[in-house]
UniProtKB/Swiss-Prot annotation:
Origin species: Treponema pallidum (strain Nichols)
Required cofactor names: a divalent metal cation
PANTHER family with a match to the protein in the record: 2-C-METHYL-D-ERYTHRITOL 2,4-CYCLODIPHOSPHATE SYNTHASE, CHLOROPLASTIC
Region (2-C-methyl-D-erythritol 4-phosphate cytidylyltransferase): 1-243
Pathway named in the protein's UniProt entry: Isoprenoid biosynthesis; isopentenyl diphosphate biosynthesis via DXP pathway; isopentenyl diphosphate from 1-deoxy-D-xylulose 5-phosphate: step 2/6; Isoprenoid biosynthesis; isopentenyl diphosphate biosynthesis via DXP pathway; isopentenyl diphosphate from 1-deoxy-D-xylulose 5-phosphate: step 4/6
Protein name: Bifunctional enzyme IspD/IspF
Residues binding a divalent metal cation: 250, 252, 284
Binding site for 4-CDP-2-C-methyl-D-erythritol 2-phosphate: 250-252, 276-277, 298-300
Amino acid sequence: MRRGGACVQKKEYLPLTSRQPGVCLLSEILVRALEARSFFLVVVTVPAGEVAYAESQVACDSRLSAFPSRTRPVILYVPGAHTRSASVRAGLDAMATHAPDVVLVHDGARPFVSVALIHSVLEATCRYGAAVPVIEATDTPKGVAADGSIETHLIRSRVRLAQTPQGFCYASLCAAHHRAATDGEQYTDDSELYARYGGTVHVCAGERSNVKITYPEDLEQRASEPALTRGISVLPCTEEGALRVGLGTDMHALCAGRPLILAGIHIPSKKGAQGHSDADVLAHASIDALLGAAGLGDIGTFFPSCDGRWKDAHSCALLRHTWQLVRAACWRLVNLDAVVCLEQPALHPFREAMRASLAQALDTHVTRVFVKAKTAERLGPVGSGAAVTAQVVVLLKKI
């Protein structure tokens, strides 16, 4: 969330409705961010000298205190600068000690962002690395020259209107912002800046209700709608404590000359699994189970075999990265239960090492992880020694 020091009219402090003067645009955004239960840190940049005032305005909204303190993210107010880009950069720099994987940048003049849109942008960002919500243009856009004449007739079907929040890999966005500062360049939004310095930005569906308050009549129009005239009554998200089950399976062919890796543990064997990475079926099935339970996608979404970056990759490192994404979405691991099916060699001697390795990758106690080893009784491709398989079930709890 951003406020630049050059803004004269402080729209973010305006009351959302006359019936609830304690609810301002900024506090409404914060309530919706807390409702999403997907953030551990929220940074608000405000004009220099206005930190205390911003805090006092937000404190007037009693809804914020209704969120449990143990799950409430830290809200940090940071002095901004005289340009939009510099203010965003100040906010990003304030996050450096927290080292987030993903960051969403939201305009403080868009108070009607929905929790569903926040989750949609987060999911697309985790999948692609950068994502922006867009809506179709309903009016026919024109490119206008300095003298007021139309110089370009844009194709409306190919034009989209960008909204916020816009999501990015934190480290990549920081690097792009600092390069832009060095070059002295200014951009109207972060997706343009990110793309200018080599990043690819994908789009996801925005919402027409996610309007930007630019003129007084924008707020007046929204305030007259029934949902707002009834008053705003937002309770903490009922998703807290929700349980989700995920299932992951994987199978790889076995061949001579390859190492056999299971949960990051090297298993002495005449044959190993074929694959683009280290072909660790137990780690791969665990990744799929976690992503499925959290509703974030699957292993092919994040680590496609066509991507050379994952050639011979250590799958437990991919599992650790996956868990960071799942944890950032406010999920806690209740337990993981796995079955590995391999005809030979016998896996029982390595079972505890595999449990410990998975627990370490998931930053959890080993008692929450269990691994069972089976044979296929000489049936099918596993029984003939041609393949190895794994099945994993996880239980996640929303926090």
